[in-house]
Amino acid sequence: MAILKAEERTDSRRSSLRRIRQSGYVPGVIYGRNLENKSVALDSIELLKILRAEGKNTIINLDINGDQHSVMVTELQTDPLKDSIVHADFKVVDMEAEMEATVPVNLTGEAEGIKQGGVLQQPLYELSVTAKPKNIPQTIEVDISSLEVNDVLTVGDIPTKGDYSYNHEPDEVVASILPPQKQEETEAESAAQDVEEPEKGTEEEKEE
């Protein structure tokens, strides 16, 4: 478990937050059951190292002036222009109790349907899971190599290894392979012609 040192802070004025960020630290909040919310400041580089190496759902041992808590990051506020973290929220977790978390879905492999000109559609980029903190995956890897045109991958198709469960209906669509656009257009045009032709025949009969 990664250890991250933090200092409790009492000054929440904007000028104070600005000074914290300018010094290379990140303001944050730690909260949880049986714990009064605490405002903290921590090293931004160390936090980034942990998240990049172990993922957002990793358990961190947050050391606040010698008082240690097992926490997970629940929210990160970032500055897209500077590619930096400007605020972090940490939740104290019970290592033996199940909790909910969102996990990114990583599709791997090249689907057969894409090789045939199909188009990949991915409605779900994250899945909500329930598990003990140590069993929450950092990513859910799904091999889509076997998917062909018109195939659909649902939540129920993705195994869980038994140590976590999905908070979704089994038939929720994670990914699908749509037919090539030209094929769809041709089928649509053909269907339109089939509808128009009987109408023309009816008009000729009326004229007779």
UniProtKB/Swiss-Prot annotation:
Native source organism of the sequence: Bacillus licheniformis (strain ATCC 14580 / DSM 13 / JCM 2505 / CCUG 7422 / NBRC 12200 / NCIMB 9375 / NCTC 10341 / NRRL NRS-1264 / Gibson 46)
CC annotations in GO: cytosolic large ribosomal subunit
GO molecular function: 5S rRNA binding; structural constituent of ribosome
Chain's role: This is one of the proteins that binds to the 5S RNA in the ribosome where it forms part of the central protuberance.
Biased composition (Basic and acidic residues): 198-208
PANTHER family: RIBOSOMAL PROTEIN L25/GLN-TRNA SYNTHETASE, ANTI-CODON-BINDING DOMAIN-CONTAINING PROTEIN, RIBOSOMAL PROTEIN L25_GLN-TRNA SYNTHETASE, ANTI-CODON-BINDING DOMAIN-CONTAINING PROTEIN
Phylogenetic classification of the source organism: Bacteria, Bacillati, Bacillota, Bacilli, Bacillales
Keyword Ribonucleoprotein among record annotations: yes
Cross-referenced InterPro entries: Rbsml_bL25/Gln-tRNA_synth_N, Ribosomal_bL25/Gln-tRNA_synth, Ribosomal_bL25_b-dom, Ribosomal_bL25_C, Ribosomal_bL25_long, Ribosomal_L25_dom, Ribosomal_uL5_bac-type
Family (UniProt): Belongs to the bacterial ribosomal protein bL25 family. CTC subfamily.
Alphabetical UniProt keywords: Ribonucleoprotein, Ribosomal protein, RNA-binding, rRNA-binding
Entry superkingdom: Bacteria
GO biological process, one term: translation
Region named Disordered: 163-208
Protein name according to UniProt: Large ribosomal subunit protein bL25
Quaternary data: Part of the 50S ribosomal subunit; part of the 5S rRNA/L5/L18/L25 subcomplex. Contacts the 5S rRNA. Binds to the 5S rRNA independently of L5 and L18.
Gene symbol of the encoding locus: rplY
